[in-house]
Amino acid sequence: VFGENLGFAWTDDGFFLLAEEDCSVLFIDYEHIVKRCPKACAHHSTVVSNLVKLMSEKTQALSEHLEILSRRTTREKLTAYFSMLAAKNKSLYFTLPFSQTSLADYICVDRSAMVRELKRMSDEGMIEIERRNVKLIRLPAEK
């Protein structure tokens, strides 16, 4: 699902999307979302509820990503991201949801510099990491 936030924006700005494979796009008019159908069917309420939930989840994910990217150093970005994953998993053990290359892209750092920082963090006893499996041992206190 994409572009759901554009339906509620009061602008005529365009939207560009490049699909990796053939696909269909369903356009839903803003008026069909905000106005109830004459029968007030349950399907309409479900669509609206799902759309609001989806927008909320995307907003939360973007907020978390922005929180990570706002950190200055690679270590601070990794620490923030690992702390979020630990909190979501309610465990100091978790599996990274993607490869180290994708992690470096996600936190906007050079992959080799990130790998060196992970090694330093491991050597300092902050984390244990094997492939995508991470165990938090201790993290620096927030400044």
Q: Which ranges hold each PLM region?
A:
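Phosphate-/nucleic-acid-contacting segments
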Residues: K77, S83-K143
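Cyclic-nucleotide recognition modules
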Residues: V1-V52
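ATP/adenylate-binding site constellation spanning eukaryotic-like Ser/Thr protein kinases
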Residues: D22, Y30, R71, R75, ...
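Basic, amphipathic alpha-helical hairpins
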Residues: R36-H44, L62, L85-S91
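Short alpha-helical segments that sit at the start of domains
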Residues: A61-L85
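Internal, well-ordered alpha-helical scaffold/interface segments
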Residues: E31, S49, K53, E57, ...
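Long, low-complexity, charged/polar intrinsically disordered regions in eukaryotic proteins
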Residues: H43-E67
